[in-house]
Each structure stands twice: as structure tokens, then as C-alpha cells.
Amino acid sequence: MARAKFLREKLHVNVGTIGHVDHGKTTLTAALTKIGAERFGGEFKAYDAIDAAPEEKARGITISTAHVEYESAVRHYAHVDCPGHADYVKNMITGAAQMDGAILVCSAADGPMPQTREHILLSRQVGVPHIVVFLNKADMVDDAELLELVEMEVRELLSKYDFPGDDTPIIHGSARLALEGDQSDIGVPAILKLVEALDTFIPDPTRDVDRPFLMPVEDVFSISGRGTVVTGRIERGIIKVGDEIEIVGIRDTQKTTVTGVEMFRKLLDQGQAGDNAGLLLRGTKRDDVERGQVLCKPGSIKPHTEFEAEVYVLSKDEGGRHTPFFKGYRPQFYFRTTDITGACQLPEGVEMVMPGDNVKMVVTLINPVAMDEGLRFAIREGGRTVGAGVVAKIVK
């Protein structure tokens, strides 16, 4: 029996390193893979292999990201590390690498720097739920009081952006010494302490299947003698024949009942997150439903027209605009399956936004869309993507 327990798949958790340039994010990433591989299995990735991050495309935006993995006693971690600051901004806004928690790396010698602040703010805006801190380069600081001071500054910064600064685990260490196999407190043991902090401070993520049902409408068909079938990919939750659902967005919310679930032309009892399914709806007419709406568990999501967003504007090289835009800019916002026109209100003191910038804005849509905080969208002009964003806060 003991053997079966050992074979059990470990819980999968997504994390990533954030923090100022040259504070040691990539060195720490390498140390995590090395010590993880030695203790719990997995593969060591050297600094150079991580630093040469391949480019990938997310929503038409090129982002350099390194993906590594390592294990703890109880979890399997998938970890992202980005070489440049711009890559972080793009990664977090597009949600290319969704994080269940982040490791904020801050040099003990330098303390919090501008990107330290910006990455914490971005984490708050895009909904990274938990942050654990690694105060790196502790071997370069002899003065214990100085370390304490830096730790206090980091805690204040976290609290300022609504993270629990006082309760956040902060581990002092040296990623470089740990990589060299140093056994002093700030070497290998510090990395093990960090992994333990990840295990305990970042709660188990809720799987998509366990969340309330939601399916964006991709297509609507009328099948004579049977009624209306709506197709799409189930984003979260489970849907069973006989369940009551709501149709939300664009127009007034309607209630209906699912009388059939189909996949690959076969009738099923239920569909779940990740499935491409067709749902047969009772008493619903072909014209009652359109692309851009969502089917959902009643009361689980509401339609909104006004929200605060964090937006990245594509540079000219990425195929974005060649010129800045100004207040009153009215592009299309592509949510899930459809474009909806909206007007942009820029922050006070911001006259224009240049290609390649990231900016906070308030958007007012001409039609309501079913949304929660954390929903990603693209900004388009005539079908061409010119930006990417995330709903930071719903206004109304």
C-alpha cells in the first residue's frame, strides 16, 4: 500500500519570479530547479538555459518567457521567469502565464527599486493572489539592522498595494551561494525554506471544474424539431442535463434550462471545463442568443459596461499602432468571442499613450459584457490587435 501513495500525482501549482532587473530572479530560478532536483526529483536548469528564454506569441504579442519546473515534497511547480521588464508587463497583462502565486525577488543590498514597486502593482491589478518574498544577495549585507530595514520597506510596499505585508513570508538568502551548494543558513537551507513557504502560503488553486459553470457562446443553431443549440468551449464548471442556466451579456439576462449536452455528435449526461460542447436550450429561440454572450450558472456572473483596466499597447514592431492615441479613443474590445466598441478614459495628467506603453484606463462599453475582475481582453481596430488588457476593477 505504501507504494501507491508514493505514485500519487502531486498537486500542480503555477508560480513565477517577479522583481527589479539584476536582483537575481534568474539565479534564484536556477537554484530552485537544482535543489528541487536533488531533493525531490526533476531536472536542473542552468542559468544560461533559463536566460536564453525562447520567444512565444500570446494574443499576437511576442513575449520571451522561460518555463521551468521543480518539485517540493507535496507539489509540482511550473515556474515562469522573464528576461526583460517589458516581457513581465506583457506576460502579466495577457495572462500568458497565469500565476497562482509569485516569488518577489528583492536584493537585500539595494532594497525595493522602481520595478519592484511596478511588479507588485501589476500583480494587484492582474489578480496574482499571493506573493512570497526572497531577499536575495544576503551575503552582501553584513549589517543585520540593514536587512531588517529592507524587509520593513518591502512589507510596507506590499501593504500599500493591498497584499498582507505583515503576514507575508520573507526569506533571507543568496541564490548564488545556494547554486554553489553552500550549506550555511543563506545557502541551500534558504531555498528549502522558500519552497516550504510556497507550499504553505500559496493555497491549493481551485480547479476550473470546481468553479461555477460558464461557457462563452461561439455559435447558435436552430435544429428543427429539437430547438436551439449553442456551441462553445466550457470555460469552467460542469453542466448537466436539466440544469437551469442564465444567458448573460449584450442584452437583458434570460433564464433557461439545458435539455441536452452534445459532444462530437454524441449525447452526454454532462459537459465540463475544457470540453467543446453543444447545449440544447429549452424554449429558447435562435434569435434569443448571439455570439459574445455567455451561458452560466444563475447569479454567478453579471453584465457590466464600465470597468478599470490595466492595458499594454502593442509597439509598432509587434504589429500595433504607429502613432499614439489620445483620450476619447474608441477601439473595439474583444472579450472571449466578440468585439464591442468602448471609449477610453485616461488617468489624470496622461494626455496620450504611445505604442509599447502600459497604462491604467477606465473603459465604457456600448453594450454590457459578462465579466469578473481578472478577465482578459484584446483591443482591436478593424480586426487587428493593437493592445491587450485585463479587467482590474468593475465600476458598473
UniProtKB/Swiss-Prot annotation:
Catalytic activity from the UniProt record: GTP + H2O = GDP + phosphate + H(+)
EC assignment: 3.6.5.3
InterPro entries: EF-Tu_GTP-bd, EF-Tu_GTPase, EFTu-like_2, EFTU_2, G_TR_CS, P-loop_NTPase, Small_GTP-bd, T_Tr_GTP-bd_dom
Any matching Pfam family: GTP_EFTU_D3
Keyword Transport assigned: no
Record's keyword terms, sorted: Cytoplasm, Elongation factor, GTP-binding, Hydrolase, Magnesium, Metal-binding, Nucleotide-binding, Protein biosynthesis
CDD domains: EF_Tu, EFTU_II, EFTU_III
Any one biological process term the GO annotation gives: translational elongation
Region (G4): 136-139
Region G3, residue ranges: 81-84
G1 as annotated region, ranges: 19-26
Subcellular location: Cytoplasm
Similarity comment: Belongs to the TRAFAC class translation factor GTPase superfamily. Classic translation factor GTPase family. EF-Tu/EF-1A subfamily.
Name of the featured protein: Elongation factor Tu-B
Organism: Xanthomonas campestris pv. campestris (strain ATCC 33913 / DSM 3586 / NCPPB 528 / LMG 568 / P 25)
Lineage of producing organism: Bacteria, Pseudomonadati, Pseudomonadota, Gammaproteobacteria, Lysobacterales
